[in-house]
Amino acid sequence: MDFKQYSPEELKECSMIEVVHSVLGDKRQATTFNELVQEIAQVLGLSQEQVNAKIAQFYTDLNIDGRFINLGENRWGLRSWYPYEQIDEEILPQPKPKKKRKVEDDGFDDYIEEDEDFDDADVTEDEDDDVEDLDKVLEDEDGDDDDLDDLDEDEDDFAEEELEYDETEEEEEEEL
């Protein structure tokens, strides 16, 4: 776009985004943000104070507008220049190779496990008492089945009440 053909009034009506789009289209190469701001100021005839007042909104608009893409290192270009696969390659940082650390010797690698046999003679009377206590606990848990039966009955009652409610509701709808 040749900006010389426009009058100063027409240029003031152009938004900064429109100017950047045409500038990038003419250059056909990615440009840093600072260079874009300088060119906009030159084309629109903005003072440094006016540029400073509008720079934050301009940067926001540049990010939001789908026609532009940030290529990293504060360089901007038109999205139409870059196929999707190429964009991924330029934006992704290169992975750094990891340094190999020397493994420290902790002394556990040399331990050889031995099969240890436990005889029944090692069982003490205290352990026998523990087994008997477990038997009592298991017997007590068998008594908890009664509570489950009560819950099943409550669920059956609820299901019957719900069925009756649904039938009553259907009859009322038929009457209408």
UniProtKB/Swiss-Prot annotation:
Q: Which UniProt keywords apply?
A: DNA-directed RNA polymerase, Nucleotidyltransferase, Transcription, Transferase
Can you give the residue ranges of the HTH HARE-type domain? 14-81
The segments labelled Disordered in the record are 91-176
User: What GO molecular functions are on record for this protein?
Assistant: DNA-directed RNA polymerase activity
Alphabetical GO biological process terms = DNA-templated transcription; regulation of DNA-templated transcription
Looking up Pfam families in the UniProt record yields: HARE-HTH
Q: Answer yes or no on keyword Cytoplasm.
A: no
Gene3D superfamilies assigned to the protein according to its UniProt record, in alphabetical order:
RNA polymerase, subunit delta, N-terminal domain
Coiled coil regions, renumbered to chain: none
Show the ranges annotated as biased composition (Acidic residues). 106-176
List the GO cellular component terms. Answer: DNA-directed RNA polymerase complex
Give the family, as the similarity comment puts it.
Belongs to the RpoE family.
Purpose? Participates in both the initiation and recycling phases of transcription. In the presence of the delta subunit, RNAP displays an increased specificity of transcription, a decreased affinity for nucleic acids, and an increased efficiency of RNA synthesis because of enhanced recycling.
Oligomeric form and interacting partners: RNAP is composed of a core of 2 alpha, a beta and a beta' subunits. The core is associated with a delta subunit and one of several sigma factors.
The name this protein goes by in its record = Probable DNA-directed RNA polymerase subunit delta
Instruction: Please report the organism this UniProt entry assigns to the protein.
Output: Bacillus thuringiensis (strain Al Hakam)
Which gene name does the record give? rpoE
